[in-house]
Amino acid sequence: MIDLKALRENPDVGRASQRSRGEDPELVDRLLDADARHRALLTSFEQQRAEQKELSRAVGKAAPQDRPAVLAHAKSRAEQVKSAEADADRARAELDALLSRMPNIVADGVPPGGEDDYVVLRHEGTPRDFAAEGFTPRDHLELGERLRAIDTERGAKVSGARFFYLTGLGARLELALLNAAIDKALTAGFTPVITPTLVKPEIMAGTGFLGAHAEEVYRIEKDDLYLVGTSEVALAGYHANEIVDLSDGPLRYAGWSACYRREAGSHGKDTRGIIRVHQFHKVEMFSYARLEDAAVEHERLLAWEEELLRLVELPYRVIDTAAGDLGSSAARKFDCEAWLPTQERYLELTSTSNCTSFQARRLGTRERLEDGSTRPVATLNGTLATTRWIVTILENHQNPDGSVRVPAGLQPYLGGLTELRAS
């Protein structure tokens, strides 16, 4: 949820943010009008309630002959107060409905535009020249099947399209990746957490995942619970309605969880293999930070992501995501995309978002200041490793015979294996 006070003071910032996202800037004006109506009606209700209390006291002090008239007046005022409260509640509901549609304010410097308007910040590593090496690279699914590591046919048989099994070397490779990610997180001072994958509606809504992209989320209607698409959701809810201590710096958690996504808007995209699937595993970084420290913490999360990409020796690029491609909670997002040889394109492997106070304001997560007051904190998140990395590791490190070289940084997590080769 955005800061209404800040929006009242500088509505042009909100309008500019909406335009950069490709959203309706008039939402800001409708929101401010609803806010003004609510505040006026709330003030009227509170004034009438105070007068009602005075009348109640007056009843007890009234002379016997005056008491019936005073009682009638008090009864009439009670009805007016009840009506005024209902008016204020309706205005609050209208305001809340508009607030739920208003995304976070985009940070300064974020490129405007949509999905294709990102800015490339840098390239790291050089893609292999397979033609110069004298062979045509196989895609990750062919490699995975030859290694008996990926089984999409049985995944589809058991669960439907976009499901799969990781078996043998595939399962070991994923566990190696995720354990390497946890070790990286521990070294960086994160507390590892195995999170719930089912959350309440208020937690899912508080993180911003029930807005425009609600169709991407699995819901268990009988229990009114949602399956998370990232442990970010559970970690954001971890300190909901709490005051956290940030006096020693950010609170950092690394969540390991299964993740579930409906991919409702992805019909026909990445249908081969395990690039875009309904279920996968991920280690997610999550930080609670002071607002003034959030931008620096965002750069730290990005740096830790890049360290892990270098550990597995992938050529990649870093992009500054355009405003129209940000989630509703994010003020800024950096993506790391690794080179995918068989498709000759970059594939997103990590993203890290600075959500400023947007999620914490909705979820009631605050810090106490020196003067005793409280304020919302900033929340940030970033992918450290996920199942999708297997795609790029197999393709970038393949040998002509279909075996796959294990990057040196992963070898300790695979029992010293230097190659993945079908037994």
From Swiss-Prot:
Which GO BP terms apply? selenocysteine biosynthetic process; seryl-tRNA aminoacylation
What keywords appear on the UniProt entry? Aminoacyl-tRNA synthetase, ATP-binding, Cytoplasm, Ligase, Nucleotide-binding, Protein biosynthesis
Entry GO CC: cytoplasm
Q: Which CDD domains match?
A: SerRS_core (cd00770)
Q: Where in the cell is it found?
A: Cytoplasm
GO terms, molecular function: ATP binding; serine-tRNA ligase activity
Where ATP is bound, by residue?
R261, R262, E263, V277, E348, L349, T350, S351
Q: Which Gene3D superfamilies match?
A: Bira Bifunctional Protein, Domain 2, Serine-tRNA synthetase, tRNA binding domain
What function does this protein fulfil? Catalyzes the attachment of serine to tRNA(Ser). Is also able to aminoacylate tRNA(Sec) with serine, to form the misacylated tRNA L-seryl-tRNA(Sec), which will be further converted into selenocysteinyl-tRNA(Sec).
Family, similarity comment: Belongs to the class-II aminoacyl-tRNA synthetase family. Type-1 seryl-tRNA synthetase subfamily.
Domain remark from Swiss-Prot or TrEMBL? Consists of two distinct domains, a catalytic core and a N-terminal extension that is involved in tRNA binding.
Quote the protein name from its UniProt record.
Serine--tRNA ligase
Organism annotation: Beutenbergia cavernae (strain ATCC BAA-8 / DSM 12333 / CCUG 43141 / JCM 11478 / NBRC 16432 / NCIMB 13614 / HKI 0122)
Q: Which gene is annotated as encoding this protein in its UniProt record?
A: serS
